[in-house]
Regions:
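Mobile active-site "lid"/loop adjacent to the S-adenosyl-L-methionine
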Residues: 112-139, 143
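Conserved SAM-binding motif I beta-strand of class I
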Residues: 63-68
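Conserved SAM-binding loop of SAM-dependent methyltransferases across substrates and taxa
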Residues: 48-61
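Conserved class I S-adenosyl-L-methionine
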Residues: 38-45
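SAM/dcSAM-binding transferase cores
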Residues: 188-237
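A short acidic, Gly/Pro-enriched loop at the edge of an enzyme's catalytic core
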Residues: 100-108
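Conserved SAM-binding loop
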Residues: 77-78
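Conserved Class I SAM-dependent methyltransferase catalytic core
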Residues: 19-22, 136-192
Length: 237
C-alpha cells in the first residue's frame, strides 16, 4: 500500500494517504485533551493515528489506543508505530460499539466526521466509514462512559452547529460537559468554525467557557497560541 509521511514537531513520522490524512482540528483536539505522561488514552475513529502519534511526539508514554473501523487506517497507524518505535501505541481495527477491553481509560478523544446527512459522494465512498451515519455523538458518549475511569474525560471537536447534540449525548450518558472552547480562524470572524468540548464521567454540574482560540494572527500567520500548541511538550506528572 502506498503512503507518504508527514513529520511532526519533534520528529515523529505519520504515514498518510489520500483517504487517511489530518488537519488542524486533530492538532487542536490532541492538545485540548491534556493527556498526561503515563495516562491511558483512547482515540476513537483514529484514522491514520494522528492524535496518539501527536501525544507520542510530545512525550506521552502511557497506554494509547488508536481505534479505527477501517483496516487501511489501522495499517497506516501500525506503519507509523514501527517507523517511530512507538511501542506504547496500539492500533486496533474495530467498531467502538462492539469493542471490549479491560482497560479503564483516563482520557477518550474523538474527532468525528463533519457531514451528517445525505449519501456520500462517489469520491467519498472510500471514506464512508467516517460518515456520521456509522457513528453518532450518542454512540461515542455511550462508549466513552463504558471505557472511562470515574471522572475520566471525553474530549471531542465538532462543528458549532452540532454543539447541542454533543452536550445532549454526553448528558444522556452521564458525562457532564465541563469545558467548551470555540475556535475562530481570525479574531474578526463572526462565526467560529470548530468547538472543543471536555466532559467528565459522573462529573459535577459546572461549565467553563474558555476564550475563543484564534488560529491566525493579523498578518495571516499562526497566532502565538497556535504556535505554542504545535510545540508544547506533555507535562511529565
Amino acid at each position: 500500500m502506498e503512503y507518504t509521511t508527514e513529520l511532526l514537531a519533534h520528529g515523529t513520522k505519520v504515514c498518510i494517504n489520500k483517504t487517511h490524512r489530518f488537519g488542524t482540528d486533530a492538532f487542536l483536539l490532541s492538545h485540548f485533551a491534556g493527556v498526561k505522561y503515563r495516562q491511558a488514552a483512547l482515540d476513537i475513529g483514529s484514522g491514520c493515528g494522528i492524535i496518539p502519534l501527536r501525544w507520542y511526539d510530545f512525550g506521552h508514554r502511557g497506554n494509547a489506543v488508536a481505534l479505527e473501523i477501517d483496516a487501511e487506517g489501522t495499517w497506516l497507524t501500525n506503519e507509523s508505530i514501527k517507523l517511530n518505535g512507538a511501542e506504547n501505541i496500539t492500533a486496533v481495527n474495530a467498531d467502538i460499539r462492539d469493542w471490549k477491553t479491560d482497560i479503564q481509560f483516563d482520557v477518550v478523544t474523538c474527532n468525528p466526521p463533519y457531514f451528517t446527512r445525505g449519501k456520500p459522494k462517489d469520491d467519498e465512498k472510500k471514506a464512508s466509514f467516517r460518515h456520521q451515519f456509522t457513528l453518532t455523538d450518542f454512540d461515542v458518549a455511550k462508549a466513552a462512559f463504558r471505557l472511562l475511569k470515574d471522572n475520566g474525560k471525553l474530549c471531542v471537536c465538532q462543528r458549532p452547529s452540532r454543539l447541542a447534540t454533543v452536550i445532549y449525548a454526553m448528558k444522556q450518558n452521564r458525562i457532564e460537559p465541563k469545558v467548551i472552547r470555540f475556535v475562530k480562524q481570525r479574531t474578526h470572524d463572526d462565526v467560529p468554525w470548530l468547538v472543543l468540548v471536555d466532559g467528565r464521567k459522573n462529573g459535577g454540574a459546572s461549565l467553563t467557557v474558555m476564550p475563543d482560540l484564534i488560529v491566525e494572527n493579523v498578518n495571516g500567520g499562526f497566532s502565538d497560541e497556535i504556535l505554542s500548541i504545535y510545540g508544547k511538550n506533555i507535562n511529565k506528572e
